[in-house]
């Protein structure tokens, strides 16, 4: 289940808590830009947190602080193309190639190398999207 939640952190945390109580299921907090509590609840319930180009914006310091709290095995990186292009492409049409910029900021934020964050987030993507063929 891919979830895009905006300005509804408390409701989303309550819904996830209630629904996962009926049985675990894979879910992804897509294009995450919410607060630390939703990230904490999502991870605690077995979900993944995916960071987009928003992570690279100068004013996204709080989001980078939240990223530091997400376990590596529960994070992904994404483009959200054609929207939310990372710095230095902000304001332009986003494209998949730009995900490398977001990955670089995520790697720096959590203190690992870019190659390591690429490996980890790729493995996480295959884990959550388990039917996706490895090419």
Pin down the residues of each PLM region.
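Residues that scaffold the ATP/ADP-binding catalytic core of kinase and kinase-like folds
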Residues: 15, 86-87, 128
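Active-site micro-motifs of SAM-dependent methyltransferase domains
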Residues: 49, 83, 127
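Residue-level signal for the nucleotide or nucleotide-sugar donor/cofactor binding architecture
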Residues: 7, 58, 94-97, 112
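Catalytic pocket-lining loop regions of alpha/beta-barrel enzymes
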Residues: 1-76
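Short acidic/histidine-rich active-site segments
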Residues: 73-95
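Mid-to-C-terminal alpha-helical segments outside catalytic/metal-binding sites
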Residues: 98-135
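Short, structured helix-loop boundary elements
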Residues: 26, 60, 96, 115-118
């Amino acid at each position: 289940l891919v979830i895009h939640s905006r300005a509804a952190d408390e409701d989303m945390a309550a819904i996830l808590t209630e629904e996962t109580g009926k049985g675990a299921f894979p879910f992804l907090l897509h294009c995450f830009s919410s607060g630390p509590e939703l990230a904490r609840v999502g991870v605690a319930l077995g979900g993944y947190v995916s960071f987009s180009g928003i992570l690279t914006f100068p004013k996204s310091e709080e989001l980078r602080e939240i990223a530091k709290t997400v376990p590596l095995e529960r994070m992904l990186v994404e483009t959200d193309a054609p929207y939310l292009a990372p710095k230095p492409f902000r304001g332009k049409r986003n494209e998949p190639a730009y995900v490398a910029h977001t990955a670089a900021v995520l790697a720096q934020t959590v203190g690992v190398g870019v190659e390591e964050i690429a490996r980890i987030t790729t493995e996480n993507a295959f884990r959550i999207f388990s039917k996706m063929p490895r090419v």
